[in-house]
A protein has these predicted regions:
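Glycine/Thr-rich phosphate-binding loops that ligate phosphate moieties of nucleotide
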Residues: 1-169
Length: 169
């Protein structure tokens, strides 16, 4: 509904490496309600993830699917948004425990030569059902991505100036 969110609440890393970047709602009107704000936040985060992912694509990565995990992955709406933004099949990692900590332990075990991280991960976790992207929504999100990227560039100086104001008060 004409609402875009830049999710840079604590700065941004890849691809901008900009600690001064800040969150911005573009297009906000009195007609937007809670549901539109929440969806804009979800879409903004998904677009930022795709923006970072694009760096890997530029370096030659071409994944067959996207695998997500964690809190956001439990939301069917967020899975749908991520799938449509990325334009690739999506699956959710189905595993118990703290997935980040377990992943770090698997990598550490591989680094020490104790185990093969890929084999250990396959025995520990499985993937949920495959979700395929909707081509129409993917095209819409690609247009939104262009606006999203342009909005960051247009506001980059504003972020710096706001930081200056904050440091003076």
């Amino acid at each position: 509904r004409g609402l875009l969110f830049l999710p840079y609440l604590t700065g941004e890393r890849t691809p901008h490496m900009d600690p001064q970047a800040r969150g911005v709602f573009l297009g906000l009107t009195a007609d937007h309600g809670r549901a539109e704000l929440v969806r804009a936040v979800m879409e903004g985060v998904a677009l930022a993830c795709y923006d970072a992912f694009s760096v890997l694509v530029e370096l030659g990565a071409h994944p067959e699917r996207i695998v997500i995990a964690g809190g956001g992955a439990r939301s069917p709406l967020w899975r749908r948004i991520m799938c449509d933004v990325f334009g690739a099949p999506l699956q959710c990692l189905e595993a118990g425990g703290d997935q980040s900590a377990i992943g770090a332990a698997l990598l550490a075990g591989g680094g020490c030569g104790i185990l093969n991280p890929a084999e250990a991960a396959r025995s520990w976790a499985s993937l949920g059902p495959r979700l395929d992207p909707d081509p129409t929504r993917n095209a819409l999100y690609q247009d939104m991505l262009n606006l999203f990227r342009e909005a960051y560039v247009k506001h980059r100086e504003d972020f710096r100036r706001l930081r200056e104001f904050a440091s003076r008060s």
